Amino acid sequence: MKPPILFTILLTVISGTMIVLMSSHWLMIWIGFEMNTLAIIPILMKKSNPRAIEASTKYFLTQATASMILMMGITINLMYSGQWTMSKTLCPMASTMMTIALAMKLGLAPFHFWVPEVTQGVHMSSGLILLTWQKIAPLLVLYQISPTIDPNLLLPMAMMSVLIGGWGGLNQTQLRKILAYSSIAHMGWMATITLYNPTMMLLNLTIYIIMTLTTFMLFMHNSTTTTLSLSQTWNKTPLVTSLILMLMLSLGGLPPLSGFIPKWMIIQELTKNEMIIMPTLLAITALLNLYFYMRLTYTTTLTMFPSTNNMKMKWKFDNTKKMILLPPLTVISTMLLPITPLLSILD
């Protein structure tokens, strides 16, 4: 893809999200979602091969269905309220339909089936955009309508997402699929806390985006796509491989890394709201995510695959990929836990 065309498409993707963020008119929000969806398709098909085309088609059909349900919810709300403006009060049917549409866009269970397949079928850079930037607009619309959402609808979806995000990643060897299932689990955590402390959801989203962005950038730096290729990078770039594994543990929520902050604060907030069963189940299912990340770290560091090259001297070319943002992003993704007391302002 030529640079001017790529720049125009990326600008349209960014513009679509910004329109959603800055609008209080439901029609403009819907138009922003449509701009974003139509512009991301060429990015997903950047590497023209059958798998990328299949993934783009799956993504388009899912997002088009979600947009149709969202427009139906907007129309029903217009019939009841007589206004297009986003307000704190929505009729129950419109709120339910909008919640389902946003859950489809986010990949919450049981609408999660497209996330691993699409992420695996596209290029690593396209997967990065898919799992980070594309989550911002739906989550912030969910944030704005959170007072009207029925907890009996959103909480079961959130709980299923955390559970499926943990189970799905257990038998994966493809790194993109592992990150996709991790994304489903993180969306479940964010959906849970949206009902009780929406501001904390924004903190969770920020930390998730930083960790996922850094992980994808390190994968692209090392050109790794599977657990086998990751284990073979010790001889080439031992420092980068160590950072990748540390980031994996942070994504799993292992203390004292940054990924532990949102889980800690969400469980604390749910407990303050006199909920016992939900935080207990979330903490138990979060162990599934932590398990497959720790297993990946263990197999990469303490065991050797048969095809791993153990030579002390190895032909090595200088890496021409210069990523200036990697050092600060890596520090933020792993060492934010000491600032947690400062976040008491969210209470």
Swiss-Prot record:
Its EC number is 7.1.1.2. Belongs to the complex I subunit 2 family. Core subunit of the mitochondrial membrane respiratory chain NADH dehydrogenase (Complex I) that is believed to belong to the minimal assembly required for catalysis. Complex I functions in the transfer of electrons from NADH to the respiratory chain. The immediate electron acceptor for the enzyme is believed to be ubiquinone. The gene is MT-ND2. It comes from Suricata suricatta. InterPro entries: Complex_I_Subunit_2, NADH_DH_su2_C, NADH_UbQ_OxRdtase_chain2, ND/Mrp_TM. Core subunit of respiratory chain NADH dehydrogenase (Complex I) which is composed of 45 different subunits. Interacts with TMEM242. It is found in: Mitochondrion inner membrane. PANTHER family: NADH-UBIQUINONE OXIDOREDUCTASE CHAIN 2. One of its GO terms (biological process) is mitochondrial electron transport, NADH to ubiquinone. GO terms for cellular component: mitochondrial inner membrane. It catalyses: a ubiquinone + NADH + 5 H(+)(in) = a ubiquinol + NAD(+) + 4 H(+)(out). This is NADH-ubiquinone oxidoreductase chain 2. Keywords: Electron transport, Membrane, Mitochondrion, Mitochondrion inner membrane, NAD, Respiratory chain, Translocase, Transmembrane, Transmembrane helix, Transport, Ubiquinone. It is a multi-pass membrane protein. The chain crosses the membrane at residues 3-23, 25-45, 59-79, 96-116, 122-142, 149-169, 178-198, 200-220, 242-262, 274-294, 323-343. It comes from the Eukaryota. One of its GO terms (molecular function) is NADH dehydrogenase (ubiquinone) activity.
